[in-house]
Amino acid sequence: RFDSIAMKENIALSMADVLTFNSSVFVKNYGRATLSTVAFRGTSPSHTQVTWNGMRINNPMLGMTDFSTIPSYFIDDASLLHGTSSVNETGGGLGGLVKLSTAPANHKGFGLQYVQGIGSFSTFDEFLRLTYGDKHWQSSTRVVYSSSPNDYKYRNRDKKENIYDEDKNIIGSYYPTERNRSGAYKDMHVLQEIYYNTGEGDRFGLNAWYI
């Protein structure tokens, strides 16, 4: 089970980054806003089951989960179950289980939280949470929005430029430095949760997650 402090300290990261820094599982990450998969030792990503509030969220076609699309800001509790220890939770997890869950707001009245992160290449991450709670009802709305032109400079070694003298003779060559023009991305996630406590020990919940 992940330490709650570690989860709070990494709210600006995806769950792929949280697993990389705080667990022994193998995370294959192709960069920001690209595919990130998780595999337990000796197995493939399709052997890793992922649940959110008890519901399996593996891709039904590929059998794996892209953890870059899961903001850690949306997760209140996370734990890992290795190998056959995951059978009690869900079947089909030969490698193991990544168990994710959210929790209702534990305070009464309205609450508002806003966090912004700024990175290189004009990268912006914005996090917003609006909560409300009373004796019977709890509501939570979380929004994550990330954007970046991702226009870093690189040396294009597929494009060689020649250097000419006054007589148009080639006297040298070089690889030009260009700026990436096709790496821009915008990513938005919305999580809406509504809970109702009957006051008799039962609680009903309705959760909706837009990826």
Listing of model-derived features with the role each one plays in the protein:
Residues 1-8, 37, 45-48, 78:
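N-terminal periplasmic "start-of-domain" segments of outer-membrane beta-barrel proteins
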Residues 10, 14, 35, 65, ...:
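Transmembrane beta-barrel architecture of outer-membrane proteins
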Residues 16-59:
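Extracytoplasmic beta-strand/coil segments of soluble accessory domains associated
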Residues 20, 33, 41-43, 73, ...:
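A short, compositionally biased micro-patch
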Residues 47, 57-58, 84-88, 148:
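Short beta-strands and strand-coil junctions in structured, solvent-facing domains, enriched
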Residues 55-82:
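Short acidic/polar hinge/loop motifs at secondary-structure boundaries
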Residues 77-79, 87, 97, 102-132, ...:
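Short strand-turn segments of transmembrane beta-barrel domains in outer membranes
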Residues 107, 132-211:
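Periplasmic-side early beta-strands and strand-to-turn transitions of outer-membrane beta-barrels
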